[in-house]
Amino acid sequence: MAVDLNYEKDSKERIPYEHYLEVYQNADPKEISSRCDVPYDAEKQEFTVSLMGVSYRISWPEYNVFHIGDDGSVSPIIGWYPLEKKPNAKILVLRYLTEGGAAPSTGKFLTYREIPWGEVYFKQFQGRCLFRLAFGFGGKLDAFREIMERVGAQAISSGDVGYELEFMKGLFVRLILWAGDDELSLIHISEPTRH
């Protein structure tokens, strides 16, 4: 007897997106705002969230996403706005809004392995992040610098080239590279006071 697994090619994005969207739509926006420390405009029914230096308005309960300028208005499409188009970015922010919570940083940075459950998923992280970063930019430090500066990252004195980027409000990531090394790169994440 054959088992129908109902597997679809896009199930790794569509199914989680639909799940977390339903959770988001049934959540209390005021509770989300308080827990995640993200502003919520009850009149407009919109959150304001920052991702990689770009501010976005996110409607509730629809989850329509628009990047906004410094004056708070929807700005023209001039840059890269992953939260508007990329399913993985949409899922990440949905998960943060439905399950996450803001916590002040301890001021220390952790490697991925030091984060709770980091050791369990380290091989996947190593392949998807560390090796790609090192292989893609280990011999192209100028290109790495240009990209990091474009997204608003600040140079730090680590490795041959290092940058610190505020990924989300209060969550900083450090990306560190060594010239010509296609195997060694480091990514450090700021440690919250609670996990």
Where would I find each of the regions flagged by the language model?
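General structural signal for secondary-structure boundaries
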Residues: 85-86, 137, 194
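Phosphate-binding glycine-rich loops and adjacent basic patches that engage nucleotide phosphates
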Residues: 103-111, 168-179, 192
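Aromatic- and glycine-enriched beta-alpha-beta binding-site module
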Residues: 59-127
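Amphipathic, interaction-prone secondary-structure segments
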Residues: 33-64, 154-179
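Short, charged/polar micro-motifs that form catalytic or ligand-binding hotspots
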Residues: 79, 83, 134, 161, ...
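Short glycine/proline-rich, acidic loop/turn segments that cap or connect secondary-structure elements
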Residues: 179-187
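Short Lys/Arg-enriched alpha/beta "domain-start" segment
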Residues: 2-45, 98-151
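Residue-level detector of conserved catalytic or cofactor/ligand-binding positions
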Residues: 187-195
